[in-house]
């Protein structure tokens, strides 16, 4: 078996928990995931099975979330799973004020990751240092947020904001919640997070673990084809002789102006062969997925 599974990660599970469960369900060792999700988050977790694990590095990095920010609360983890540092009612906060501030988080921004995160500093993961009580300065990173759209606003002593966020890889939604609360000196924390899109996969097409188990028992499960999430890349087809040479590591001269990574197929069978790099009319093998003889 090889391909992808668009998994709807359940609440409370780590991404590694999901991989371990799928290894048992599928009776395969070669299982991996793209884009780690926090245990408290749910939604799209792309799972690669078999040889498709070699394609994880080529998946698109765009992601989308539905997030709930709670104002007036600050925690150690920047979500509701951590210890409360401060709690102060802020019923006077208005949606118009919040909307005005959202523009500060759109575009390429400098973001300090939460101290409870898998980021490594000096070879150590931040959450390991945090659990030991060690204090360390977390360096800011450049991330990109494409859009933030307001979905709902609930007034109260601890008002909540629902937003849809589209962003690039490495963006921490917990950090956005924290920093948004800091602007108003109220504190802010992430109350809920659903990933609605990741690496070419959408929540509407995802499977829960129960769905997957049901399909496996019925013998109806088929993984998503290995090249399905790579449709953002242009494609190149090679006749059988050229395809064979390319799969053996040879460069193929092509009269094409395209430059960059491409999907490569055998013309006669439309078999996905792998990922190539086009450079000035030459197709260079990057990753041979399906060698042919």
From Swiss-Prot:
It holds the Pfam family TruB_N. The active site is at residue 38. One of its GO terms (biological process) is mRNA pseudouridine synthesis. Its EC number is 5.4.99.25. One of its GO terms (molecular function) is RNA binding. Keywords: Isomerase, tRNA processing. SUPFAM superfamilies: Pseudouridine synthase, PUA domain-like. It catalyses: uridine(55) in tRNA = pseudouridine(55) in tRNA. InterPro entries: PsdUridine_synth_cat_dom_sf, PsdUridine_synth_N, PUA-like_sf, PUA_sf, tRNA_psdUridine_synth_TruB, tRNA_sdUridine_synth_fam1_C. Responsible for synthesis of pseudouridine from uracil-55 in the psi GC loop of transfer RNAs. NCBIfam families: TruB. Belongs to the pseudouridine synthase TruB family. Type 1 subfamily. This is tRNA pseudouridine synthase B.
